[in-house]
Every structure is written in structure tokens, then in C-alpha cells.
């Protein structure tokens, strides 16, 4: 069973003996863990000797009217799940422990990368992600940290943060873990009704179809996107965004497609009470 710490000073003291030689991995989560989170721990164990999992529903990354109050808190169940995959420590701080003053006077702004995709409709979200991840990095001082690729934009922002703030931390992006029908695993999937859960896999199916169309290069990108948006909307989703970007999240058009080895199709869409995120990498065949 992993050791649980609720205070920064206690966790630091527990980790101090490991600073000299063993590698420490951090897996940041908001709890309500599923198989996708457990796979992050499995990956972390491949790269480190000690694995710390943080469980903290971070208020600074939620906007007005979002689901901060209703987000599931399931600490006991989470710790039991983490025991099955061999996590060593759980850090589950209170809000007061993480933020003596709320909102925190110090902020971390990641620049233009936050102004697109999720950042368009959640303008303060990545500011909150930046401050909490920076605090966790400072508290745990890991050698490696593991994040899921489902939150593709977040992963890109964290890589930028590590580079710009000179953290000596290896960031590992873990492949998306999916249900048998293709739906990307997410704690918010439990918001879906039974009928919505049957519809939800259509999102991934559309991403795969769109990726194939991009590689076939039979139609302009904007035509492909328009048709895909119409299909997704007709299935019952409310689209926040559906966009094609370079792997580095810069803009791409028909003239510049062949300049890149890889593109990514990203989507955020509402279905009932759930906001679903997914993405699909697209390898460009330059011979076509």
C-alpha cells in the first residue's frame, strides 16, 4: 500500500533519502482514477525507482460554471487502485496546503500556445495548470514526470514550461488508453448517460476517418474539416473545436502539409454533461 502524505513538508521529508541515487517519478492526477491513470504509473515505474502520484482537484484550473464542486473525490478507492500497480507515495494535499492565498498572487503564463484549442473557451485553465504543475515539480523534485497524450495541448504546454524554466525533468507523454470501443478513458466519462455512452465512440471513429482522408490528400483540409464537423454534430455532439495542427500545435494548410512529418487532429466536444477530448496523430506520406 502506498504511503499517503497530505502536507508538503512530510512528503519532502519522506523523499529526502532518495535524492542521492534513485530516480523519482511524478504522476500528477486529480484523482477518480481509471485504467488510463494506472497505465501512467506503470510507465513511470519503467523509468524510475520511486513513483509519487499526486491527487489534487486543482481549483485554479477550473473556470466559472465548470465542474469543480461536482468533480468526483474518491481518495480511498484511488489509493487501493494505486496499491495494485505498485505506486510508492500518494500526495493528497488540501487546497490550503497548496494555496495559502487563493487565487495565488504568482501566476505562470505560457503564452500564445494557450490561446488556441481548449484555451479559447477556457481562458484561465492553462494558467491554473501551469501554477499547480510548477508547484508539484518544486515539491516532489522528480527526475521524470508522466502525462497522458489525451490532453495533447496540456502536454505541449508542460514540455514548454520545463524547457523555459530550466527544470531538469524528463517529460514522458503516455499513449491514450481507450475502452474496447475506442472511447478515450476519462474521469468525466461517468457523466455520460447510457445512451450517450453508446454515441461517444463516434468521436474517435471520426478522428480515424479524418486522419485517413488527410493522408489520402484527395480534398482540401478545410473541406475535410467542414464535413467532419457536420457528421459529428449530426451524431449529437456540441463541438468546441475540431482542428488540424502540426505536432507542435502550429497552424497548417494545404500548401504546408508536406513540410511536416506528422500532424495531429484534435477535438473537444460536449455530449450531455460530459466534455470529451481526443486526438489522433497523422503520419504524412510525402510520396503522394
Curated annotation (Swiss-Prot):
One matching Pfam family: Pantoate_ligase
Domain of life: Bacteria
InterPro entries named in the record: Cyt_trans-like, Pantoate_ligase, Pantoate_ligase_C, Rossmann-like_a/b/a_fold
Subcellular location: Cytoplasm
Membrane spanning residue stretches: none
The keyword Heme is assigned to this record: no
GO molecular function: ATP binding; pantoate-beta-alanine ligase activity
Main location: cytoplasm
Residues that coordinate or bind ATP: 30-37, 148-151, 177, 185-188
Entry binding sites for (R)-pantoate: 61, 154
Pathway membership, UniProt: Cofactor biosynthesis; (R)-pantothenate biosynthesis; (R)-pantothenate from (R)-pantoate and beta-alanine: step 1/1
GO biological process, one term: pantothenate biosynthetic process
Gene Ontology cellular component annotations, sorted alphabetically: cytosol
Known EC number: 6.3.2.1
Residues at the active site: 37 (proton donor)
UniProt: beta-alanine binding residues: 61
The reaction(s) this protein catalyses: (R)-pantoate + beta-alanine + ATP = (R)-pantothenate + AMP + diphosphate + H(+)
Presence of the UniProt keyword Nucleotide-binding in the record: yes
Enzyme class: ligase
Subunit composition and interactions: Homodimer.
PANTHER family: CYTIDYLATE KINASE/PANTOATE-BETA-ALANINE LIGASE (PTHR21299), PANTOATE--BETA-ALANINE LIGASE (PTHR21299:SF1)
Family to which the UniProt record says this protein belongs: Belongs to the pantothenate synthetase family.
Name of the protein this chain belongs to: Pantothenate synthetase
Organism: Psychrobacter arcticus (strain DSM 17307 / VKM B-2377 / 273-4)
Amino acid at each position: 500500500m502506498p504511503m499517503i502524505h497530505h502536507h508538503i513538508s512530510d512528503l519532502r521529508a519522506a523523499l529526502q533519502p532518495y535524492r542521492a541515487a534513485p530516480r523519482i517519478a511524478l504522476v500528477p492526477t486529480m484523482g477518480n482514477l481509471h485504467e488510463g491513470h494506472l497505465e501512467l504509473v506503470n510507465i513511470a515505474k519503467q523509468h524510475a525507482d520511486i513513483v509519487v502520484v499526486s491527487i489534487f482537484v486543482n481549483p485554479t484550473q477550473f473556470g466559472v460554471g465548470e465542474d469543480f464542486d461536482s468533480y468526483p473525490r474518491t481518495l480511498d478507492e484511488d489509493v487501493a487502485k494505486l496499491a495494485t500497480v505498485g505506486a510508492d507515495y500518494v500526495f493528497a494535499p488540501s487546497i490550503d496546503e497548496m494555496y495559502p492565498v487563493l487565487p495565488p498572487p504568482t501566476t505562470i503564463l505560457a503564452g500564445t500556445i494557450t490561446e488556441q484549442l481548449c484555451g479559447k473557451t477556457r481562458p484561465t485553465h492553462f494558467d491554473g495548470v501551469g501554477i499547480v504543475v510548477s508547484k508539484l515539480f518544486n515539491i516532489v523534485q522528480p527526475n521524470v514526470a508522466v502525462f497522458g497524450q489525451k490532453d495533447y495541448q496540456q502536454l505541449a504546454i508542460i514540455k514548454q514550461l520545463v524547457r523555459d524554466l530550466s527544470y531538469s525533468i524528463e517529460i514522458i507523454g503516455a499513449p491514450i488508453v481507450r475502452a474496447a470501443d475506442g472511447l478515450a478513458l476519462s474521469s468525466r466519462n461517468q457523466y455520460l448517460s447510457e445512451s450517450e455512452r453508446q454515441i461517444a465512440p463516434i468521436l474517435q471513429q471520426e478522428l480515424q476517418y479524418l486522419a485517413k482522408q488527410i493522408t489520402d490528400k484527395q480534398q482540401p483540409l478545410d473541406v475535410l474539416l467542414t464535413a467532419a464537423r457536420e457528421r459529428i454534430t449530426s451524431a449529437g455532439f456540441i463541438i468546441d473545436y475540431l482542428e488540424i495542427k502540426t505536432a507542435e500545435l502550429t497552424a497548417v494548410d494545404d500548401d504546408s502539409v508536406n513540410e511536416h512529418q506528422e500532424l495531429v487532429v484534435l477535438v473537444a466536444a460536449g455530449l450531455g454533461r460530459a466534455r470529451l477530448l481526443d486526438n489522433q496523430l497523422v503520419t504524412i506520406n510525402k510520396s503522394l
